[in-house]
Amino acid sequence: MGQVWTAYDQRLDRRVAVKLLRPDKVAGQEADELRRRFVRECRVTAQVDHPGLVTVHDAGSEDEELFLVMQYVDGADLADHLAEHDPYPWQWAVSVAAQLCAVLSAVHAVPIIHRDLKPRNVMVKQDGTVTVLDLGVASVMDTDTTRLTHTGSPIGSPAYMAPEQAMGGAVGPYTDLYALGVLIHELLSGNVPFTGSTALGVLHRHLYEPPVPVRRLRPEVPESLEALVLRLLSKDPQHRPSSAQETYEQLLPLLPARGMPTGSPLDPTRPFLRPHAPWPDRARIPAPQPSAAP
């Protein structure tokens, strides 16, 4: 929703991210809906205080243009991170998923449903921590927020959309957990579980086709991780894990043990291997060697 620009805050001497929206570019009811969704994003994003979410600094309007000023996140989005590491280490996938569970647990406690969790909405920072972006399509569960746009289209991305969301039905934390299952499957296999030439075709597969177990594509993936992904991708929400907390607990035995060596940037295992360590982590960076005498 809208465009995001890197900007400079002259007052506080810092880089920020600015999301811009021009409702005048959309006519009639759609413009009103975009305004409402933008205001909701500002309020929703400001409600949740968690290190895995961007901080909102300011919001307002200027010359018919709505703006949201947010924390600038230095890193790579998860889609690019995946493209640069093929195959994606399963330990990295577990570490990303565990961090996402912590964020989702905080978001669901508000209670808010993200409804558009996907790699493009996740940033991996230089220190390996993960940040979730774009609560702009979030549904605040204790309000009468519509589940469909005024055009009748479900809000979200078809490749990551839970069956109940695709049908325009009630959504809940279980909806985000399905998207998390799609995301983990993509990290492990390199592709989302369901593809198609049209959005409708993709949604049909979410509704009626079983996903391919990831160990058929990557035998080195632990059986327990494959089983968790299949649970997350259950068509029936009642067959999925009951919460992000439960999902985290199932990932916990698969997380790397503390003290194992790490030092490279954008390594999502680092927060578990070296919790609270400074970044750059000088203890993990070899000291420069003196140059040889001429």
Question: Model segments located where?
Answer:
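AlphaC helix of the eukaryotic protein kinase fold
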Residues: 22-47
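Activation-segment/catalytic-loop signature of the eukaryotic protein kinase fold
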Residues: 59
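Activation segment of protein kinases
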Residues: 26-33, 126-170, 197
